[in-house]
């Protein structure tokens, strides 16, 4: 469960009734012979459903991807029927606690893929939440230089424990000046902004170099209205793009986990039993930004 799932519990903007949760692993109980899946096989589920596979013929530039747990019923149940294309077998070397982050890794892969980066480029990441730290780890793997910015010292410490060398706390340092020092005066070529990170977007123009690229990533569900001075964006001729899902990147995400590229230690805050959800959710909702991932054990 994530902060988005908690927002659904709180009654924010979802089309009810709906079953939340978009990340799940499980065991195959039944499978068609043509599916390639085996009974008892450990799998991770993709929440992405392509609404119209013929979108290109209709002139659309990007596919309309629905997300289970947000646009339709999700995975918070003890049994679910899934199409084979949404079911991915897990290699033996991937632990359950790592596999549960496949969806967020896929989103981070797609987000960085939307940028035309080159080795050695600086990438400022606004928010040291789970997605932000995963994106920073990927930056290192791609030989980029991540700079993670957050007001939460605990989250920054977690980022540092994951090998992120440059972290900035705006309450302790001038963000722009610190990035100038880190980049040798260039500022960041790229900035990733995840609105659910609880960071404000007003840093974007001041930390991104002229002509740089900004990617707004994550889900646009349950967000408050965010304000960004477009005059500053125009003045610096910033390129702005958006990535709201990891559709098409699940195999890459699994491969990254299998090769130990992504370290998920510290991302899971607690594990609760399925029968305890009604009691635990009110406690979690009191400060959903304090939580990375809450795992629900349905066994």
What are these regions (language model features)?
Residues 1-24, 167, 299:
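Short N-terminal strand-loop motif that marks the start
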């Amino acid at each position: 469960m994530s902060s988005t799932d908690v927002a659904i519990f709180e009654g924010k903007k979802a089309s009810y009734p709906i079953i939340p949760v978009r990340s799940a692993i499980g065991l195959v109980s039944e499978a068609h012979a043509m599916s390639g899946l085996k009974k008892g096989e450990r799998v991770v589920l993709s929440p992405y459903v392509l609404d119209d596979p013929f979108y290109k013929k209709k002139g659309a530039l990007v596919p309309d991807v629905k997300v289970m747990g947000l646009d339709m019923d999700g995975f918070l149940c003890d049994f679910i029927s899934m199409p084979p294309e949404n079911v991915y077998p897990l290699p033996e070397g991937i632990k359950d606690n790592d596999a549960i982050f496949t969806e967020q890794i896929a989103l981070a892969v797609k987000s960085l893929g939307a940028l035309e980066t080159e080795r050695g480029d600086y990438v400022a990441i606004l928010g040291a939440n789970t997605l932000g730290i995963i994106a920073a780890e990927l930056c290192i793997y791609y030989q980029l230089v991540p700079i993670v910015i957050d007001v939460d010292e605990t989250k920054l410490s977690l980022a540092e424990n994951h090998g992120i060398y440059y972290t900035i706390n705006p309450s302790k340092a001038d963000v722009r000046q610190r990035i100038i020092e880190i980049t040798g005066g260039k500022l960041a070529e790229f900035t990733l902004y995840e609105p659910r990170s609880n960071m404000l977007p007003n840093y974007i123009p001041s930390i991104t170099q002229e002509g740089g690229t900004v990617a707004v990533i994550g889900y646009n569900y349950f967000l408050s209205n965010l304000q960004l001075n477009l005059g500053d964006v125009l003045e610096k001729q910033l390129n702005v793009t958006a990535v709201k899902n990891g559709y098409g990147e699940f195999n890459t995400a699994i491969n990254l986990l299998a090769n130990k590229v992504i370290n998920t230690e510290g991302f899971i805050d607690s594990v609760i039993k399925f029968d305890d959800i009604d009691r635990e959710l009110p406690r979690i909702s009191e400060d959903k930004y304090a939580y990375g991932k809450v795992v629900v054990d349905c066994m």
